[in-house]
Amino acid sequence: ETKDSNLLTLGPGWTRKDGYVIGVAVAAGESSWYFPIAHKSGNMSKNIVFKWLQKLCNDEKITKVFHNALYDLGWLRAEGIEVKGKIVDTMIAAPLLDENRKWYNLNSLARDYLGEYKDEKLLKSAAEEFGVDPKSGMWQLPPRYVGKYAEQDALITLKLWDNLRKKITQEECSSIFELENSLLPVLFEMKTKGVRVDVDKAHKTKKDLTKIEKSLIEEIVKETGVTVEPWVATSVAKVFDAVGLSYSRTEKSGSPMFTKQFLANQTHPIAKKIIKIREINKANTTFVDTILEHSHNGRIHCDFHSLRSDGGGTVTGRFSSSNPNLQQIPARDP
């Protein structure tokens, strides 16, 4: 378990050294344990726990089973622990068996393949008492409330792999699984290294685009007296009204409607300016801002997907990325 405050917005914090491990859950056979190391109280010795865990992870005879291995491997490395030997990820096994599932999180897979759920009652009750979110605020809870939940994570992952492994064999997908699973170390090193970006150039590009956008908006103000908000239909309607241009409305509510195609078909210069403002605004907010937001020490550590998952990926198995999507580039308006 971790304190990973910016996980949902910027991705796993281990690439940015943003957060830390609060405890480790381990399962073997039918047993499971939770070792708290960085809660606000009730912790075990971090040095002793990590010394034991390092020995366990270094044993190449032991197969290590994870659900979303890249996340755990990253945080373990951030704490100085390298995992050696065979690594299995149930998030690789699951989409091989069913690439059309809506969800691949542990609870969803456990429900469908094992007929069981993680019991979150104690965790949620404690979170409500302490006034924190049960997941993102877990680090603020005493270990006695987190331990049972964390142990379930580890034990269910082990049970799930036992179930999925049999189904993979039955479906004659073992060789494909081994191939996909063998990519794990490569994907991990790719994410760890990151993709180099020119942050200074990104800042300059943002500044230049903002200047052009502001200039176009000011031109429209001089012509119409309206400070246009390019993505707000009612605002664009005021500009059109000011120069006597007609426009479409939605059938249901009668609200103004300005699609990209409609604006492109207009010959009036002011419509062209609105199109340009939209293009510049999108380039800034969708591409440049994303680069600046996700960059750390001149690199972007995005998530790479070889298969489907809750975080992204494709049904066909085409390689993809997210947080941010590096394949998303402004092809028509470079």
Task: List PLM regions with ranges.
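Conserved "right-hand" nucleotidyltransferase catalytic core of DNA-directed polymerases
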Residues: 1-40, 84, 101, 109-114, ...
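Nucleic-acid-processing active sites and adjacent nucleic-acid-binding tracks
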Residues: 29-64, 195
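Alpha-helical scaffold elements adjacent to nucleotide-binding pockets in ATP/GTP-utilizing enzyme cores
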Residues: 52, 72-75, 105-109
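Short glycine-rich phosphate-binding loop at a beta-alpha junction
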Residues: 61-70, 227-229
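A structural signal for short, well-ordered beta-strand segments and their strand-loop junctions
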Residues: 64-67, 87, 178
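Conserved nucleotide-binding/hydrolysis micro-motifs of P-loop NTPases
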Residues: 70-73, 97, 101
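Phosphate- and divalent-cation-binding pockets in alpha/beta enzyme and binding domains
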Residues: 71-78, 238-239
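Conserved beta-strand -> loop -> alpha-helix junction used to position metal-binding or nucleic-acid-contacting
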Residues: 82-99, 105-111
